[in-house]
Amino acid sequence: NVSAYELLFRSSLDDVFSCSDSDYASLALLVNSFIAIGIDRLSSGKPVHVNFTQRLLQDGVPSLFPPEVVVVEVLETTMPDPAVLNALARLKEQGFTIALDDYVGQQHLEPFLKLVDIVKVDFSLASSAHRAMIPRSGVKQDAVFLAEKVATRDEFQAAVRHGYRLFQGNFLSHPEIKRGSDIPPDALASLHLL
């Protein structure tokens, strides 16, 4: 069963991220998904995980979207400074689900663990011992663990054994690239101004 989708920016039909401006990539993804393509067409009514940069979190950009539709993903490169932690607390008050992306036990991300609802553990980076240990780490009681980049049946079965409840990766499904029309420059500029 699909519980949610993850929306990722791609500037070409190759399944790789190739944009040097992460703020632009996130904003372009949001405009394409909600305006050019249509979020219902992409998600069939399921929530969508969207990566938000530190700057976009601080600027409150996730608040422009419905909390029942968008799961706010905090990137592993985001520093847990007071402005970001306050922004995440406000988003939670508004009803957003918060996910921590690509967690493999990085100490600098620990302040997020008390806030997030979903901890996404990157199975391509974490050792098998680390994968087993992370769900027992200092995370809030009701946090859900998502095993991402699960590539084999063995990884999937190990994730189930270790208490992961959500799963993502090529073992389960391959990403699909959906193409929208070109984004009108004024639409992207308007979103950025908001």
Annotate each predicted stretch with a short phrase.
Residues 35-36, 58-59, 84-86, 104-107, ...:
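A generic local structural motif
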Residues 1-71, 76-79, 83:
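Bacterial c-di-GMP phosphodiesterase EAL domain
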Residues 1, 10-16, 73-79, 103-105, ...:
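EAL-family c-di-GMP phosphodiesterase catalytic domain
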Residues 84-95, 132-141:
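Surface-exposed amphipathic alpha-helices with a cationic face
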Residues 91-105:
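Sensor-1/coupling segment of RecA-like P-loop NTPase cores
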Residues 44-48, 66-70, 94-96, 115-117, ...:
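Short, well-ordered coil/turn segments that N-cap beta-strands
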Residues 33-40, 90, 137, 158:
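A generic secondary-structure signal
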